[in-house]
């Protein structure tokens, strides 16, 4: 396995670790509605950081974006909005199916759709099936889905052991949302593929290869921001039990800490895709679609590891923990098989 591919896999792991941890500081937020917290975090993750970092990277911020026509910018933006819809659906999936079943179905679907649809649309799927390297990467994708399923099963065992159930369990509604969420969440993978001309132009302007994908986040995350912030604002306006004014009226010390914890969560959320860009830059161009598989499978892996480190599995018994470890090892195996396939 080449050093560049190993480095790419490593950076995807770092990004997934940030993704698995971003909600931890947001759990410290108190006496605020979820909508206010999510909106404040989103301002940092979807607007301030993408714009600020891109302004710093690009020699001429305005001329870079004006260089592209709507034929490039609109698909990138719409795929970002598509991902934003999936992001909202993810939370609703947890409500109706519970964490484990919801994550297992939604992540499994988005891993498959986001990874395989790109080569299918590009007409390259047959080429993958015909080559040894392509066959190995596809086997790795299948094994990764198995790993996600095993980790999700471990979570189901954990929930049963500690008596946790879904907030409003509804199998029919939950499955429909999980499928929708899985498909729409893959919009980020499609957006990255559609933004390839933006990456190439950034490289032409002298942006370091590790950073060439970051300017496209202004457009991608702009699409996601409109959906997510719009959702939060509409709920804050229309739901009588929610009040942005009341959230902003808490005592000064709590207000500052809530803003800081929300901002920290948003910053950590952004850095999952900051390092995604680094990982993507080290993956061979003809296997760029595998970045999504690595990110999503590592996200599940890191979520399991973080849970173990935080002793969330301490009182669940040996079986759930054992199944979790097996699932994590399967995901590690999948990543190695994909890496070997890309190097073949």
Curated annotation (Swiss-Prot):
It catalyses: L-rhamnopyranose(in) + H(+)(in) = L-rhamnopyranose(out) + H(+)(out). It comes from the Bacteria. GO terms for cellular component: plasma membrane. It is a multi-pass membrane protein. The keyword Membrane applies. InterPro entries: L-rhamnose-proton_sym_RhaT. Signal peptide: none annotated. GO terms for molecular function: rhamnose transmembrane transporter activity; symporter activity. Keywords: Cell inner membrane, Cell membrane, Membrane, Sugar transport, Symport, Transmembrane, Transmembrane helix, Transport. It is found in: Cell inner membrane. Its main location: membrane. The keyword rRNA processing does not apply. Belongs to the L-rhamnose transporter (TC 2.A.7.6) family. Uptake of L-rhamnose across the cytoplasmic membrane with the concomitant transport of protons into the cell (symport system). This is L-rhamnose-proton symporter. The lineage of its organism: Bacteria, Pseudomonadati, Pseudomonadota, Gammaproteobacteria, Pasteurellales.
């Amino acid at each position: 396995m080449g050093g560049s591919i190993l480095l790419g896999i490593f950076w995807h792991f770092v990004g997934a670790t940030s993704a698995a941890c971003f909600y931890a500081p947001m759990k410290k937020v108190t006496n605020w509605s979820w909508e206010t917290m999510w909106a404040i975090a989103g301002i940092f993750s979807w607007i301030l950081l993408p714009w600020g970092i891109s302004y710093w990277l690009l020699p001429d911020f305005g001329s870079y974006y004006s260089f592209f026509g709507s034929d490039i910018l609109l698909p990138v933006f719409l795929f970002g909005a598509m991902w934003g819809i999936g992001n909202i659906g993810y939370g609703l999936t947890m409500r109706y199916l519970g964490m484990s079943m919801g994550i297992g179905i939604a992540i499994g679907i988005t891993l498959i759709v986001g990874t395989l649809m790109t080569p299918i649309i590009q007409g390259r799927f047959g080429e993958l099936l015909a080559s040894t390297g392509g066959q190995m990467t596809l086997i790795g994708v299948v094994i990764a889905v198995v790993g996600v399923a095993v980790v999700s099963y471990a979570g189901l065992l954990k929930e049963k052991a500690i008596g946790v159930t879904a907030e409003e369990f509804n199998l029919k509604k939950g499955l429909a949302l999980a499928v929708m969420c899985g498909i729409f969440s893959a919009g980020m993978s499609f957006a990255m593929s559609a933004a390839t001309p933006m990456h190439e132009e950034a490289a032409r302007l002298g942006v370091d290869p590790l950073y060439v994908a970051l300017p496209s986040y202004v457009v991608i995350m702009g699409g996601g921001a409109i959906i997510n912030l719009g959702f939060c604002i509409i709920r804050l306006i229309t739901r009588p039990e929610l009040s942005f004014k009341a959230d902003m009226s808490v005592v000064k010390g709590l207000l500052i800490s809530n803003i800081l914890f929300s901002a920290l969560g948003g910053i950590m959320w952004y850095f999952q895709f900051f390092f995604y860009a680094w990982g993507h830059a080290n993956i061979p161009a003809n296997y760029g679609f595998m970045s999504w598989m690595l990110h999503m499978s590592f996200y599940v892996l890191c979520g399991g590891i973080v849970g173990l480190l935080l002793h969330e599995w301490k009182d669940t018994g040996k079986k759930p923990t054992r199944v979790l470890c097996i699932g994590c090892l399967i995901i590690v195996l999948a990543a190695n098989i994909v890496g070997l396939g890309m190097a073949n």
